[in-house]
Curated annotation (Swiss-Prot):
Protein name (record): Gag polyprotein
GO cellular component term of the entry, any: viral nucleocapsid
Biased composition (Pro residues): 329-346
InterPro entries, sorted: D_retro_matrix, Primate_lentivir_Gag_pol-like, Retrov_capsid_C, Retrov_capsid_N, Retrovr_matrix, Znf_CCHC, Znf_CCHC_sf
Native source organism of the sequence: Bovine leukemia virus (isolate Japanese BLV-1) (BLV)
Top-level taxon: Viruses
Length: 392
């Protein structure tokens, strides 16, 4: 994450205030170095130790930092106050400095443009992992959650493609769909309100123009819209009735999908498409066995996945394996032998019909059917041939 220190705040400052100070430090010119962040941390320790109270917007102004002791920290504080005063988010001068906790929630520092300086760099996988690790323990949509993403965006100046990659990495499919819906609506409203001298329709949409190397204010505007859409979509999903609809243990997938469709049709606001949101919701709220089956059909389209759920019955309950043979009821009397299959032709021993050769009555006694194959004598069997016995 560049030269930024840990997002965890030191003692004596709230997480929101610390993230705002880090964002303000990123606006220094020339860019901040590790020593600037060390000075900022030492200033917070000094303030908390000398003032005996946490650092806040009202008590920690530029004049609270002794000149020449903490490097460029006064510039960081001045930039923070200037940005918040322009946005109207800082507390008024009449606010008491000794305000007991809980403190009023501070304003979120917006993303501002730094001219045409090319600061963009694509996020590496390690950086995406760091961002996800920083926000996974924070409440989605909270100020600290938003500010952490703001700081990451301010450091890398991401393009729309980079932000889409980040959304896919940190959000679930349901959150991604809801975020894209909110972002599309926000971009349409911004394009209608932006003057033509700033956003030229002939050059492309806001998304296309903000991807250019020297987009400047347009890219900052897109980044703010992306964050705003993320916060709105998370709040909408958390408060909607369909967020609690899950498939019952004995409920068929068809009934579950129908219940979800009815809830979406009744509760989605006007202008929000239902179909893009239906498939990820179904995949997330299905039972584990059915969800695994659907993930196995990953090669199909989203509509085919949802339609394929109609072929899946209710989840199967685990049962003991059936025996290979189940004995039937005992019949009175001796057990009857199985009927024998009739022979296909006459016996090859006695040339008579009606029995198999193995059951031939002449097998043990009687003349052989033909001459001995060894000595050609027709009066004895091969086993009784004297020639065979003399050889043995």
């Amino acid at each position: 994450m560049g030269n930024s220190p840990s997002y965890n705040p030191p003692a004596g400052i709230s997480p929101s205030d610390w993230l705002n100070l880090l964002q303000s430090a990123q606006r220094l010119n020339p860019r901040p170095s590790p020593s600037d962040f060390t000075d900022l941390k030492n200033y917070i320790h000094w303030f908390h130790k000398t003032q005996k109270k946490p650092w806040t917007f009202t008590s920690g102004g530029p004049t609270s930092c002794p000149p020449g002791r903490f490097g460029r920290v006064p510039l960081v504080l001045a930039t923070l106050n200037e940005v918040l005063s322009n946005e109207g988010g800082a507390p008024g001068a009449s606010a008491p400095e000794e305000q007991p906790p809980p403190y009023d929630p501070p304003a979120i520092l917006p993303i501002i443009s730094e001219g045409n300086r090319n600061r963009h760099r694509a996020w590496a996988l390690r950086e995406l992992q760091d961002i996800k690790k920083e926000i996974e323990n924070k409440a989605p949509g909270s100020q600290v959650w938003i500010q952490t993403l703001r700081l990451a965006i301010l450091q890398a100046d991401p393009t729309p493609a980079d932000l889409e990659q980040l959304c896919q990495y940190i959000a679930s499919p349901v959150d991604q769909t809801a975020h894209m819906t909110s972002l599309t609506a926000a971009i349409a409203a911004a394009e209608a309100a932006t003057p033509s001298r700033v956003l030229t329709p002939k050059t492309g949409t806001l998304t296309q123009q903000s991807a250019q190397p020297n987009a400047g204010d347009l890219r900052s505007q897109y980044q703010n819209l992306w964050l705003q859409a993320g916060k709105i979509s998370l709040l909408v999903l958390q408060l909607q009735p369909w967020s609690t609809i899950v498939q019952g243990p004995a409920e068929s997938s068809v009934e579950f999908v129908n219940r979800l469709q009815i809830s979406l049709a009744d509760n989605l606001p006007d202008g929000v498409l239902r179909n893009p949101l239906l498939t990820p919701l179904v995949m997330q709220m299905l039972t584990e066995s059915v969800s695994k089956f659907c993930r196995g059909e990953a090669s199909g389209r989203g509509g085919a996945k949802t339609a394929g759920l109609r072929t899946i019955g209710p989840p199967r309950m685990k049962q003991p394996a059936l025996l290979v043979h189940t004995p039937g009821p005992k019949m009175p009397g001796p057990r009857q032998p199985a009927p024998k299959r009739p022979p296909p032709g006459p016996c090859y021993r006695c040339l008579k019909e009606g029995h198999w050769a193995r059951d031939c009555p002449t097998k043990a006694t009687g003349p052989p059917p033909g001459p001995c194959p060894i000595c050609k004598d027709p009066s004895h069997w091969k086993r009784d041939c004297p020639t065979l016995k003399s050889k043995n």
